[in-house]
Amino acid sequence: MQVQKMVRDNSNNGSDKSVHWERRNNNGAGPRYRSRSGNTGALATKLSNGTLSVRGLVKDRTGSGKIAGCVEAFLDARTQLNTPWDRAKCNWLDQIDYYVQLRKTAFSKELDQLRKPMIDAYVAEMRQKFDASYGQSRAQLEAKLAQVDSEWHMVHGDVHAKLEKLVEERRFLKRLSDTIVPPRSKRSQRLSPLTKEDRANCICPQPKGMSDTAWFEAIQKKMLGMNGTIKLLETEQKLLADEKNSVRKTFWPMVEAHSRSNEFAYLEKCIRLMASQRAICFCLDIEAFETNQNVITEIGISIYDPRENMVPSMVPITKNYHLIIEESLELRNQKWVCDYKDCYLLGESYVLSLKECVHFIQSLINYYLVPVTEEDKTWSRAFVGHHVSGDLKWLETIGVKFPGRGYEGHLDHTLLLAETPGDLDVFILDTEQFYRKSYGEKGSSLGKILRLFEIPHAFLHNAGNDAYYTLHLFMKFCDVNFRKISGMDDVLKVMGQVKVWGERDVREPKVVPMSYAISIEEAVKNRTYRKGVKSSRKERVCQTEFGGLTYFGTAKDAFTSTLPTH
């Protein structure tokens, strides 16, 4: 069993005079993590699947690595946030000149009129392609159902016709029976007398000399036999219906969206909203602790503001943030999902207390999703996410307030108001729903969709990365040019590719990105193994370059660090 100890090293390293911590084993071997900031130090914490280094976090966290302690600390912090606090005062962005000027930027109706004919023409073309795919899909399904009917008919005969005939015959015998011996409910009624044709019927005729009473008993016996046969035929009919339903459920490719469907209406509204470049998109992703879903570990935010993208540019400008909650810092997922909280690809991750995380998020929401000026009110606003309703519920549990009509948190999941949005309407744009309404449920995870449309990605299940990829995926879903080049409207072709990937997933091993912590650990082992071997080659560590984690005492300080220094 290895015993570990913390060693404080105050040695100078060039111009970096910051204190750093080093975790060593008894044999002196172990990775060294130096602070790259001017903060007073960094705490390296040994975790189940790697060492986590946080620049600027110097307080003693002894014992907090225990799961129960971290969970308790998070839940206690969440309980304290349930007390009333003034969310409206989270508005530091309105104190920064750059963001003040953005609020004075109005949506251009002239540009909107120029874009509209192009969007209308594309949607008309999209309708035709979806209808064609829908027609082909339905024709294939009907052919398969007809084949099931034919095979069933060869074995069982025409069950439906047999059942209809038998039910009609039973109905006739029931009328005869009720006429001979009227039931109590019909004794007061005047029933039609039996005719010669009734008595000579081919189902259960009355022989000459047979009394009505005996004939009644014969009819009852005949009806009893019919009841058994009818039940048998009904069972066979139900089995046929079940088999056809099974064919419908398992049929591939099943296209649901066509030009008159609710699915297509949702797709069209999303595309029109985004292609008009009217919508300010606030994308969210939450990562929770796998053994206690009440505990949030990471929050990722990516924002696309069309006001920052009005000047023609080849690259869309987005604002990206990755927040790690201090109380749950040491909680690492590993059993069900990979933990990549220290693998943020878009810069530094900010370690904040739960309270300051809430202030950070609320400040962004209050700026981007709550209009203040008249120019502000000319823009639409939307939450974006992959199954975003779950992320919104998580944020509600920690006290984040969402805008809507009357600022009461009424969010529009249906896009019914997308064509005539009000000042306070906030739409819900969901990449999972968009995909499913287009291509069905198979392959609807974020990673599989990104892979399907050849969108580069890595280190999913880092909340910051997921938010960024989700936002860009939705923008590509609604980008007319990307849809044309990628063939997104050839629904059957896309669904065929989904099937191919599904078959490959069964045959091939799952590819999982290697955490840089593991890379460093392997490098240390290699150095130990090669000890004493001289080499002119400089030692290398194979890893992805990340921005690392930095601790901030307040949300405002964390946000201020993102602003340009000039």
UniProtKB/Swiss-Prot annotation:
The record's listing under Pfam families reads: DEDDh_C
Annotated segments matching region Disordered: 1-41
InterPro entries linked: Gfd2/YDR514C-like, Gfd2/YDR514C-like_C, RNaseH-like_sf, RNaseH_sf
- A single GO molecular function term of this UniProt record: nucleic acid binding
Q: Output compositional bias ranges, type Polar residues.
A: 1-16
**Function summary:** High-copy suppressor of DBP5 mutation.
Q: What is this protein called?
A: Good for full DBP5 activity protein 2
Source organism (scientific name): Saccharomyces cerevisiae (strain ATCC 204508 / S288c)
